[in-house]
């Protein structure tokens, strides 16, 4: 079963950056770690993306075969963890929890 996350997209367009949020679907078994990401707020303020400044973000690290991918997701690490954890089997939860 896949879970839905809201990903912060940052597209460099030369002198400006286009910042948006889009829905993505992730296999929860591929999630390696989830950490709160306070650096997003300062970046959004610097980029004048004030519509997202009052939101919380976390860094989600996922394993894809030979490589890992990090995304900035909307929500606290606890909120995203609860979403991921609710879709995992008990044996997979044990691995995620350490």
Predicted regions, residues:
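Eukaryotic intrinsically disordered, low-complexity regulatory linkers and tails enriched in Ser/Thr/Pro
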Residues: 1-98
């Amino acid at each position: 079963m896949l879970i839905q996350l809201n990903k912060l997209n940052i597209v460099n367009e030369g002198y400006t950056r286009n910042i948006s949020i889009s829905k993505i679907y992730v296999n929860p078994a591929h999630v390696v770690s989830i950490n709160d990401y306070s650096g997003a707020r300062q970046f959004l303020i610097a980029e004048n993306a004030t519509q997202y400044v009052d939101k919380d973000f976390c860094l989600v690290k996922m394993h894809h075969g030979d490589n890992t991918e990090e995304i900035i997701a909307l929500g606290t690490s606890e909120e995203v963890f609860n979403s991921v954890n609710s879709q995992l089997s008990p044996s997979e939860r044990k691995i995620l929890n350490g």
